[in-house]
Amino acid sequence: LKLSAGFVGFDGTENKRTLIAMDAVKKAAGIEGDINVLLRQPHGRAISILGKLSRMCGVKAYVSDEGDKAKWESFGFKIEGGFNDFFEASDFVMIGSPGGQETPYVEAGLANDCYVSLMGGAKRPKIMAELEEKGVEISDELKADFEREFFFGLENYEMFASAKPKVIQCTSCNTTGICRASLAARPLGLKMIMGNIDRRHGDPHTVVKASPSAIDIGKGVGHQGTDAGTVFEEVTYSIRASKAPTTVPHTSFLEFVFEGDVTTEDFVKSLANTREVVVMPYEDTGGRAHEWTSEILEAFLSGFERPISPEVYELIVSDSIIPVKLGDHTIMQVAMMVEQMSIAVPNHVESYLLCAGYPADKVHATVDEALNCVHGTWPDKLSN
């Protein structure tokens, strides 16, 4: 297999993590091809991460604007070519540009017969409308790609492999977390998930102009549950997304509604058996409580060697689940944590393997072993 991968927005919080992960998975899967990055104007963060990616992954750099070539070369980087050269050299393009800026890259990717993978925040209907306004022909097959459910490889890899799409949109960070939890809960008779996501609003790339002790409560349901509903159509989702101006992980407080009698032990066991889900004991065998999100992240991360910190590919779920019996249904109140910059990375990488034609029966094990993604119960009952 050979499939060269290109990254737009290579220095973004998710994309740089995806690039390093893809390099590891490409090698593990025996897939040949270059890893290319498209540069804009040089700035400190981009210069720093390009140096790291060059050392670790041997990336090849291209510039969007020929006027920036000399600037990048002055920092000691070799520039392979320009905007069109980047797309000609790439068979697969991961677009991680800021929201609302994806269309020209999608257009160039399709014009060069690239597979295009979008991150969760992209607005496909808007992108398709903008392409049509620019005179791009939208075939029935391409229209189906823009309207297809979100890609969540643990559930729908085989369906996507049969469809052979040119455009894929991966689940976002919180949607990925909801989908993994849904995958664990479905065998127990899951009917509905409702509740609230406290979305952190203090990421490294975000300047927060808000009270440090105030929360934006949000209006109506967020896209996260709605997007998960395209993957798990039999489940009803009603999830609000608020914003908390902190750097803690996104923290979801959700109610899982099951038909019939379900025990917390059943749910914990199913969560621990689901790929890329880790159950965190509220109280460990030594009697120490794990009740603060910052301490939970520190405790988990300390046991792994990963290229960029923080890097938590796993959904972390506290075992402090509160069961409620309501008639013929059981409701489980659950607290779970999503590290926004890295949880979707395994899914991004699977979108690349999908386009490379990698077999469905090997894909999840290959990704988890290459990235050392674990599932189970922390600290000593974890496996790939």
What residue spans do the PLM features occupy?
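Active-site catalytic microenvironments for nucleophilic, acid-base chemistry
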Residues: 184-188, 257, 354
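Hydrophobic alpha-helical scaffolding
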Residues: 171, 217-218, 338-341
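N-terminal Rossmann-like NAD(P) cofactor-binding subdomain of oxidoreductases
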Residues: 1-206, 363-367
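C-terminal substrate-binding/catalytic lobe of Rossmann-fold NAD(P)-dependent oxidoreductases
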Residues: 13-75, 196-199, 205-335
